[in-house]
Amino acid sequence: MVAGEHVLDLACGTGIVARSAANKVGANGRVVGLDRNDGMLAVARNASSGISPLIEWRRADAQNIPFPDSAFDIVFCQQGLQFFPDKSAVLREAYRVLEPKGRLALSAMRPIKHNPQYNLLADTLERHIGPNAGMMMRSPFLPLSTNELRDLLKSAGFQDVQILIGIGPVRYPSTKEFIRREVASSPLAGQIKSLSDDNEFAIMVRDLEAALESYIDDDGIVFPAETYFATARR
């Protein structure tokens, strides 16, 4: 990323990537953050107040990006692809709005079988709250192998596809905090809060602690998490 480039942050959420991009492309560049969630965009707008160049925040569907062909030098999608029902359509749109030789960079959590500690959390939520809770906790994990992700990108038209697997430690001070922080920004937050002073929450914590026993040390819980990092060119 260099000064003057035009950048699209797809599924921008609270705008962390867009703000970082704005610092790099400078006053002669352009940064657009696109998301379909009004609440996320409100947080992003507030957090970006005073950043130059002015970041443009747009509410839109990533399957129908409201920009012309070849409008951007770079498209980012950080931890967003896994949430789109039609991933192929989103990638085709990303390809369309990139200029020739434009770049795509995305990240997504690897399948949950490669992140078994989160599967244990999902199982625990399923037992104590219900099937929908488990399903929601599994939704941030892209259900594609490395080769399937590569094929998906190539089928959208991308070239020079490179995929890396990042493995990094995740640490929480306690099992209780693991549960609370992981569901804090999800629709489950209210249900967890309603249990927080209840015996059922304590039972749920003990249940998960037993499942995560081999990952507990004197500072809390620590385990490896696996993420895809993919880059490609139009």
Model-derived features: where do they sit?
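Short glycine-dipeptide loop
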Residues: 3-4, 27-28, 98-104
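Class I SAM-dependent methyltransferase SAM/SAH-binding core
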Residues: 6-65, 74, 89
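Conserved Class I S-adenosyl-L-methionine
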Residues: 14-16, 140-234
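Conserved hydrophobic residues forming the short capping helix/wall of the S-adenosyl-L-methionine
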Residues: 25, 48, 125, 153, ...
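Acidic/polar helix N-cap motif
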Residues: 61-64, 68-69, 86, 145
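A short SAM/SAH-binding and catalytic strip from SAM-dependent methyltransferases
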Residues: 73-87, 110
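Conserved catalytic/acceptor-binding region of the Class I
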Residues: 88, 96-173, 189
